[in-house]
Amino acid sequence: MLFGMARIAIIGGGSIGEALLSGLLRAGRQVKDLVVAERMPDRANYLAQTYSVLVTSAADAVENATFVVVAVKPADVEPVIADLANATAAAENDSAEQVFVTVVAGITIAYFESKLPAGTPVVRAMPNAAALVGAGVTALAKGRFVTPQQLEEVSALFDAVGGVLTVPESQLDAVTAVSGSGPAYFFLLVEALVDAGVGVGLSRQVATDLAAQTMAGSAAMLLERMEQDQGGANGELMGLRVDLTASRLRAAVTSPGGTTAAALRELERGGFRMAVDAAVQAAKSRSEQLRITPE
């Protein structure tokens, strides 16, 4: 079935489920092709009233759905996946045609494949918090029964909330450490920059405005330069590494002997790179500890 004609069931109406719902609607999806399963009455009412979407049980939502996005908390996965498996079997859906997409942190593809009907295509997706404003990045890892077309269709689904890339499942713990936890690193840096700005005489409001806009503008510069480099603009090599692009931009805004050079010297002296590396390593290790695989 073509993605444009597909029915999408979102199981779990929390922040990520709502982000995907709102993103799909912004991208032009028809509300009649979307259904949400949410157990909390207040939350269910909110979603129904805000988006005019059908909110029902998981068992009803999965019936006739081409894509089933599981967006519940890890602690709720076992009973939810049991309900979905039973509903799928009862509805006699073709397991090879119904794609399950999990955004549940730490739950492996093998776990879902072991609980769902044999041959069910499973894609594991790792979006980050920026999906809430349509500017996230999602890493996808495909299970063994997923066809190239199905993976392309799932990628199109997550295009609605930001950028999408595909990685082996073995890299998802690293993805979690970089992009999943990444917004928190960013917010901590902004917090520190604002505090430092107040320390040199700025009001907190002015320091916050300056820091936030500087971060947004710097990210825009990096993304634009990456796009130029990867497209071979100005005769440059295709596929230039992002770290080299960032390094070039940093050099371009750092005058020898100037204020930025003095500031960067202090960051290096304070172990900035080592702290970032240690943080990412710790997040990756914790993600590995939280992983749930088939028994």
From Swiss-Prot:
Keyword Amino-acid biosynthesis: yes
Alphabetical keyword list: Amino-acid biosynthesis, Cytoplasm, NADP, Oxidoreductase, Proline biosynthesis
GO BP: L-proline biosynthetic process; proline biosynthetic process
InterPro entries hit by this protein: 6-PGluconate_DH-like_C_sf, NAD(P)-bd_dom_sf, P5C_Rdtase_cat_N, P5CR-like_CS, P5CR_dimer, Pyrroline-COOH_reductase
Subcellular location: Cytoplasm
Catalyzed reaction equations: L-proline + NADP(+) = (S)-1-pyrroline-5-carboxylate + NADPH + 2 H(+); L-proline + NAD(+) = (S)-1-pyrroline-5-carboxylate + NADH + 2 H(+)
SUPFAM superfamilies according to UniProt: 6-phosphogluconate dehydrogenase C-terminal domain-like (SSF48179), NAD(P)-binding Rossmann-fold domains (SSF51735)
EC number: 1.5.1.2
Any one GO molecular function term: pyrroline-5-carboxylate reductase activity
The keyword NADP belongs to this UniProt entry's keyword annotation: yes
GO CC annotation, single: cytoplasm
Pfam families: F420_oxidored, P5CR_dimer
Pathway the protein takes part in: Amino-acid biosynthesis; L-proline biosynthesis; L-proline from L-glutamate 5-semialdehyde: step 1/1
Disulphide bridges: none
PROSITE patterns in the cross-refs: P5CR
Role noted for this protein: Catalyzes the reduction of 1-pyrroline-5-carboxylate (PCA) to L-proline.
Similarity comment: Belongs to the pyrroline-5-carboxylate reductase family.
Protein name in UniProt: Pyrroline-5-carboxylate reductase
This protein's encoding gene: proC
